[in-house]
Amino acid sequence: KMWQLIVVSALLGIGSGLIIPLSTGLISKYFVGTYRVKQFGLSSAITNFTLVIATAVTGYLAEVSWHLPFLVYLLPLISILLVGHLKESRSDTAVEPSSQSTAPSGQTAAADTGGSKYGIHIRHLLQIMLFYGVTTFIVLAVIFNLSFLMEKHHFSSGNSGLMISLFFLAIMAPGFCLDKIVDELKERTKAYSLLSMAVGLALIWIAPIEWLIIPGCILVGLGYGVIQPMLYDKTTHTALPQKATMALAFVMMMNYLAILLYPFIIDFLQNLFHTQSQEFPFVFNLLITIVTFFWAYLRRDTFLFNDQLK
């Protein structure tokens, strides 16, 4: 029944909304500096890799029986077991206050709250939220609209599924060497990532052939794969350690807000410009990406875009 599906989906959403910022907050709690950037990258890589594997396995199981894909929802049992181990680890470390006190003091010194009584630099947090929302909105064109564009050019649904899988694999890839990427690009990291996304969207838009759509999807994914974990790391610098999870929750909220609003915004703009072209989302998001690229490049020395590792 539809109401049962809605309830189950809502419960899954609530669970994810609680778990994701809490688990990400653990990274900010136990790691600082370059190691924190590396861990955020690995976390992002593992998350996106798991997404690709789960999607592939679910598709295979669905061919056997429609009941089997729901076995995926048993995977959180592994997380429950790991949480028990984490609880034991925390109780062990609580016995050693000297080692525990070192990291928070470093974190507190690194966090600039702008004198806020809430323990969070509100202006910096809002900048991160806006930027994360915009970049997520940009890449949603690949997730939501690529299959329709490829259908228009007479590609099969299997081909579009392959392209989207490559996109998620590309998001995963930078996570394994994120610290090295940031160390090389420094304050130009986000600008060059946006440039990669812009080139990717342009390739998808202008080329109705697989051999240009494939690198297009990969370039968009690579750019987003760098930006996403770097924004999580940047968020931890806006808040005191005890407020980091709350700040991360606000930032991650923009991801889901962008997903929620994207179809309505694109539909509204298509009606406004009297077009139902399948290329429109890619052209519109390409323009947003170009504008955001110049913003990131010209403001590369500001808090939001300066990613020099310390």
Residue ranges and their predicted role:
Residues 88-128:
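Juxtamembrane intracellular "pre-TM" segments in multi-pass secondary transporters
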Residues 173-186, 270:
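Helix-to-loop junctions at the C-terminal end of transmembrane segments
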Residues 33-34, 42-85:
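Helix-loop-helix hairpin linking two adjacent transmembrane segments in secondary transporters
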Residues 8-47:
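Cytoplasmic helix-loop-helix junction between adjacent transmembrane helices
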Residues 3-11, 211-219:
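Paired small-residue
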